[in-house]
Amino acid sequence: MSQKLTSFYKKCYNYTNVHPILALRMGGMKLLRKVLAFLRSRMFIVALLLILQFAFLFASAHYLAEFYRAVNAVFLILSIAVVLYIINRQDNPAYKLVWVSLILTVPIFGGLLYLIVGGNHDSRRFVKKLLAASDGTARLLRQDPDVRRELAAEDSNMAVQSAYIERAAKYPVYKNTHAHYMPSGEAFFERLILELKKAKHYIFMEFFIIEEGLMWDTVLAILKQKAGEGLDVRMMYDDVGSLMTVPYRYDAKIREKGIKCIAFNPFVPSLSLRLNNRDHRKIVVIDGHTAFTGGSNLADEYINGYPKHGQWKEAMILLRGEASYSFTSMFLQTWKYYADRYYEEDMDYELYKPQVYMDEAEPLEYAGFIQPYGDSPVDDEQTSEGVYLNLVTKASRYIYIATPYFVVGNELLTAICMAAKSGVDVRILTPHVADKVYVHATTRSYYRQLVEAGVRVYEYTPGFVHSKLVVVDDKVCTVGTVNMDFRSLYLHFECGVWVYQNAAVQAVRDDLVSTYRISQEITLEDTKAGLIMRLVNTLLRLFAPLM
């Protein structure tokens, strides 16, 4: 009997004494049930519909171009026009390159494909309505000039970074805020339950993924209880992020429990421009004075409920105080846009300021400067990338990074390599166990260039690191939802917190240092690859912006 089969039996049946032939049949039945379940799943139906639409579109374009020269000429002119349009857009050069290459390779079909699924050109109605929702909170997000002057007097370098966030994202920097860093999903879950139970007035939650299980079921039970007590409880989840984890129209089931709920950007199985723009944020706001954000979704995977990818490494942060209002604003802006179809309400944003119920919150120590920020694909400002670039380019001693995916453009890659070449201690932590094989392979394709530049690259050997962290010089850090990949930096709704001179900075540093110790450092020898693998890496890097 082969070693692989023996391993298969043991894995499936926990080393029982089942006869090998019977075990093989049982394993086959188990696999068949999984296949049948997948064929009945919403994901399979959606994927099939998209493939059929894509095939029909391609076949139609090819047929028309083959038999009608005028149509062929129109498609070619369209592709040329699209190429010129792409070149003149304010997109990342790598994103432009992959689309221009694709269009030039398939000129008849490429231009049409870009117009349908490429780019980030949202409908005017979509942009206008989101901006209108933002206007409602804008006047309450004005920068306190005294805080700005105090930060500038303390550190002009940090003041410049903060000023960029204020101008690009329209969120001010605050004092009078406590920050508490949580280095795992388990720590976040424990603190989340504690804070939810204390809620007296309202709870706002916004997540990319929710999945039935211990974590979400526990949270849902509390939300239902609080809604029954008369609290304003609102839940928002991304319809694509939760495509495989909750049933179809799950938002309606949640509303039946007395909880206001909407699915962000409801997914329709059609080739569409809006398919790319997902809500990757993770936000919890409780009574205006307390907020959470970070990498964790509401699913058991994030609290190591099951070892799908080995040990799951997570990072979250809690804010208590004035800075919480920025997250309240982010939530209400998005809620206002999508909730109109379910709820008729005129929101008085003053009611949600942290000062309204601050006296009821447990007093905690305030320190330093805290600046939450949001990033939206509906404008031409890549705020999250700007935050990362500012942190990297202004570092003098060290830059410690954790990211589940490292698939970046030339600007961020060059900045990181230049910092290392300038003598800054640059370290990057990525997963050892892949959740998406092709993205993991693309991440590894950057290793050689990084290591040659002097960057110390580590893989988290216990499993999968999902933290999104940057900490610099024992002074400043950012914790949030933003992966170092094209989707997070250019296509998704994201958020994070910039933290300066707060105990959370040291906590992030200590967490990363201890995690580096149990991770494998990548050497130049590890990055060697044969001809075929180098070719694969080249292709992966070329198409990285589409991942």
For every predicted segment, state its role.
Residues 208, 404-405, 439:
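Glycine- and other small-residue-rich loops at beta-strand/loop junctions that grip anionic moieties
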Residues 395, 405-426, 431, 436:
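Helical hairpin unit composed of two closely spaced alpha helices linked by a short loop
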Residues 314, 402-403:
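A short, conserved beta-strand element enriched in hydrophobic/aromatic residues
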